[in-house]
Amino acid sequence: MREVISIHIGQAGVQIGNACWELYCLEHGIQPDGQMPSDKSLGGCDDSFSTFFSETGSGRHVPRAVMIDLEPTVIDEIRTGTYRSLFHPEQLITGKEDAANNYARGHYTIGKEIIDLTLDRIRRLADNCTGLQGFLVFHSFGGGTGSGFTSLLMERLSVDYGKKAKLEFSVYPAPQVSTAVVEPYNSILTTHTTLEHSDCSFMVDNEAIYDICRRNLDIERPSYTNLNRLIGQIVSSITASLRFDGALNVDLTEFQTNLVPYPRIHFPLATFSPVISAEKAYHEQLSVAEITNMCFEPHNQMVKCDPRHGKYMAVCLLFRGDVVPKDVNAAIATIKTKRSIQFVDWCPTGFKVGINYQPPTVVPGGDLAKVPRAVCMLSNTTAIAEAWARLDHKFDLMYAKRAFVHWYVGEGMEEGEFSEAREDLAALEKDYEEVGVDSLEDNGEEGDEY
């Protein structure tokens, strides 16, 4: 089997984890106590769910996951919640004091007390696998645990499991709304430290998802549960090909092969469609062409940036449900004729397609409509550099005055790390810029480059 271990770090990671596992259980017909009712009619007789769940002798299905937070409150909610008996107590790891939105606490002081325990628990999960594919790491950029502890763990995972794929789902700080003043510091420090250890990082930003909930689902004041359920759908679409059988299945490493043209340029944009409320779905059936088109609308994206200002390097379309290759090819052909979608000239084809026959599942009583087909688009576009530029600018404003820096230095960080991280991100912005330049113009410079 090709197992995948999910690692959920910090409040954002753990709460997205809750939404994801709730959804996986529904999709595979696994009850909150881990039992799978004997009628196997739900998932067919295949056990492809074992990429994400391990089965115990007593017939319980346990997620291959660990939840880690440096303070206990968020994980305590799992320990007492509906899914408390789904997880083994050893999979829920908590510290005593939190990282206080401070990267340095998550990475150095508080983080290092819990890292060995965490690696030990991950090792136990890994030993339980026959052919581990890799890790999915869920975290936010802005929090102390999400930024600091994640980067520490990624470094250690690279050492222990060298060649295994590591994919991240990261909550990027939203442009307007902020949960912490020091988000730009944490984000840039963690991006710098994890850049060489992560193979592919799917970013979502809360503001973009708020807007989608407001616009498409008519939720006036979206809660984190609303946001996370939507993120859960995306994660589920991306991992569906690992958990179910389909016409064109996509493996973890296959994502990277098709989406990451250069090692550093590994931040695809995620877009999911259709996001419609149950009331609307009752009146409209969306065709393959329509949902595919919706993916190219900037307001359906999970990060605020405008792909019309950038160029696409690669696009991965993951369909699920009632979809046949013929419709997909027709939809893609139509999109290619539209001039608004620009590809870099060195990547002419650029579309990778996955089709999975398992229709999308929704959480009962949730806001999303049950639809016969859905698509998740992962696109590597130069437009995402806008998001970095925005963050770098915020970083510069604070760092010019050395605001808040003493909190980091006090936890054992050196001030040089800030400027080093900032330079690395400036280089990343430059990388994106160069990738978008047409190859005809820069033939003369090729020599200096390497």
Curated annotation (Swiss-Prot):
Record's subcellular location: Cytoplasm, Cytoskeleton
GO BP terms, alphabetized: microtubule-based process
Active site: residue positions: 254
Signal sequence range: none
UniProt keywords, alphabetically: Acetylation, Cytoplasm, Cytoskeleton, GTP-binding, Hydrolase, Magnesium, Metal-binding, Microtubule, Nucleotide-binding
Binding site for GTP: 11, 71, 140, 144-145, 179, 206, 228
Catalytic reaction equation(s): GTP + H2O = GDP + phosphate + H(+)
Enzyme category, top tier: hydrolase
Chain positions recorded as Mg(2+) binding sites: 71
Site (Involved in polymerization): 450
PTMs per UniProt: Undergoes a tyrosination/detyrosination cycle, the cyclic removal and re-addition of a C-terminal tyrosine residue by the enzymes tubulin tyrosine carboxypeptidase (TTCP) and tubulin tyrosine ligase (TTL), respectively. Acetylation of alpha chains at Lys-40 stabilizes microtubules and affects affinity and processivity of microtubule motors. This modification has a role in multiple cellular functions, ranging from cell motility, cell cycle progression or cell differentiation to intracellular trafficking and signaling.
Residues carrying N6-acetyllysine: 40
GO molecular function, one term: metal ion binding
Disulfide bonds: none
Subunit text: Dimer of alpha and beta chains. A typical microtubule is a hollow water-filled tube with an outer diameter of 25 nm and an inner diameter of 15 nM. Alpha-beta heterodimers associate head-to-tail to form protofilaments running lengthwise along the microtubule wall with the beta-tubulin subunit facing the microtubule plus end conferring a structural polarity. Microtubules usually have 13 protofilaments but different protofilament numbers can be found in some organisms and specialized cells.
Similarity comment: family membership: Belongs to the tubulin family.
Role description: Tubulin is the major constituent of microtubules, a cylinder consisting of laterally associated linear protofilaments composed of alpha- and beta-tubulin heterodimers. Microtubules grow by the addition of GTP-tubulin dimers to the microtubule end, where a stabilizing cap forms. Below the cap, tubulin dimers are in GDP-bound state, owing to GTPase activity of alpha-tubulin.
Identification of the protein by name: Tubulin alpha chain
Organism lineage: Eukaryota, Metazoa, Ecdysozoa, Nematoda, Chromadorea
